[in-house]
């Protein structure tokens, strides 16, 4: 049996501001932006450049009970992990584009990592795993 996680839903305040952030600040590719009239919503999917794995489904908070979770889907913990093949290239580009890093780069036993916030305050790891890390054989 072969299975995979296709999308991770990220609750956002507004489709267009989220698309702008992810495509302009993080260089993600807009995979799909389809209006679904029967549900009066959009199906918006983005992914890191060159990625063939899991994508982000940008899901607008449309109900009152969803709105408090914009920017806090993981209770203040790091929510998503953006793996890169060149940490310093991506870190420097992100800083130049105004991405807010809340934890500075650090060399750990598993690789190089820094924590940044997206436009809503969700925490992300930017990381480059060591070549011998078990995930590095699967990632990228």
Regions found by a protein language model. Name each.
Residues 2, 9-54:
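Core segments of cupin and vicinal oxygen chelate
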Residues 49-54, 62-65, 87-88:
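Short, charged/polar surface micro-motifs in flexible loops or helix N-caps
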Residues 37-40, 52, 64-65, 130-133:
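Flexible, glycine-rich phosphate/dinucleotide-binding loops
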Residues 5-7, 75-79:
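Eukaryotic phosphotyrosine signaling hubs
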Residues 1, 10, 34, 42-45, ...:
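Vicinal oxygen chelate
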Residues 15, 85-88:
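Helix N-cap motif at beta-to-alpha junctions
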Residues 48, 60, 128:
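Pocket-edge structural micro-motifs
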Residues 60-63, 67-76:
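Helix-adjacent hinge/juxtasegments
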């Amino acid at each position: 049996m072969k299975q995979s996680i296709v999308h991770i839903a990220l609750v956002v305040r507004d489709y267009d501001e989220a698309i702008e952030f992810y495509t302009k600040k993080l260089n993600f590719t807009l995979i799909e932006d389809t209006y679904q009239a029967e549900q009066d919503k959009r199906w918006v999917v983005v992914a890191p450049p060159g990625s063939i794995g899991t994508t982000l489904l940008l899901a607008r908070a449309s109900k009152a009970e969803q709105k408090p979770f914009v920017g806090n889907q993981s209770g203040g913990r790091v929510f998503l992990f953006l793996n890169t093949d060149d940490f310093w290239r991506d870190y420097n580009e992100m800083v130049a584009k105004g991405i807010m890093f809340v934890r500075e780069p650090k060399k750990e036993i598993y690789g190089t990592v820094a924590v940044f916030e997206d436009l809503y305050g969700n925490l992300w790891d930017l990381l480059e795993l060591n070549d011998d890390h078990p995930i590095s054989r699967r990632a990228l």
